[in-house]
């Protein structure tokens, strides 16, 4: 499965309860962008970045959910997966709303990536991925609600599941392996 539908619904509810104008897709994209740019998986740094994005410190339940989101992303990168899981609405959601969420995910990713300090310049391939994401962020509402529109959406979503891995390989901080037990 390429999306986390129940997680998306849960985050939507938490964000709506707190009257926050950020979508779950944008929040997840922001986290992945930070991680791929080299911010690593530090819990405190992520909570601080999320608080800035949300416009203030999150409540206890949202803070716990943000921690869980970080754990989900960490798992994607530590399991050696060939694609990441995107936090997007389920396939039953109208295409226009799913396309809007995909654009929000890209906007969040670009913001998270851009706000993270990194050394050196990017390869042409990495720059192309970021340009693709910027273009995808602009397509909101432009896909037809048809079989062709669904196919286009799925192709773009699959591309976005793989593209972050290229950026992570180039800029990301590798996960530190768990310490090996010592024998005494």
Swiss-Prot record:
<dbReference type="Pfam" id="PF03695">
    <property type="entry name" value="UPF0149"/>
</dbReference>
<dbReference type="InterPro" id="IPR011978">
    <property type="entry name" value="YgfB-like"/>
</dbReference>
<dbReference type="InterPro" id="IPR036255">
    <property type="entry name" value="YgfB-like_sf"/>
</dbReference>
<comment type="similarity">
    <text>Belongs to the UPF0149 family.</text>
</comment>
<dbReference type="GO" id="GO:0005829">
    <property type="term" value="C:cytosol"/>
</dbReference>
<protein>
    <recommendedName>
        <fullName>UPF0149 protein PSPA7_5968</fullName>
    </recommendedName>
</protein>
């Amino acid at each position: 499965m390429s999306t986390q539908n129940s997680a998306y619904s849960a985050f939507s509810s938490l964000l709506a309860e707190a009257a926050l104008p950020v979508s779950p897709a944008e929040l997840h994209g922001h986290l992945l962008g930070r991680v791929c740019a080299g911010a690593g998986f530090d819990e405190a740094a992520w909570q601080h970045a999320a608080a800035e994005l949300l416009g203030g410190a999150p409540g206890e339940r949202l803070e716990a959910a943000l921690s869980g989101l970080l754990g989900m992303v960490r798992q994607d990168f530590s399991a050696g997966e060939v694609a990441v899981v995107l936090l997007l609405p389920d396939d039953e959601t109208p295409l226009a709303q799913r396309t809007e969420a995909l654009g929000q995910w890209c906007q969040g990713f670009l913001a998270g990536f851009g706000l993270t300090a990194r050394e050196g310049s990017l390869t042409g391939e990495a720059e192309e991925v970021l340009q693709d994401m910027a273009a995808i962020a602009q397509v909101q509402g432009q896909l037809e609600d048809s079989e062709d529109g669904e196919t286009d959406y799925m192709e773009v979503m699959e591309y976005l599941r793989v593209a972050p891995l290229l950026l992570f390989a180039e800029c990301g901080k590798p996960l530190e392996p768990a310490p090996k037990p010592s024998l005494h």
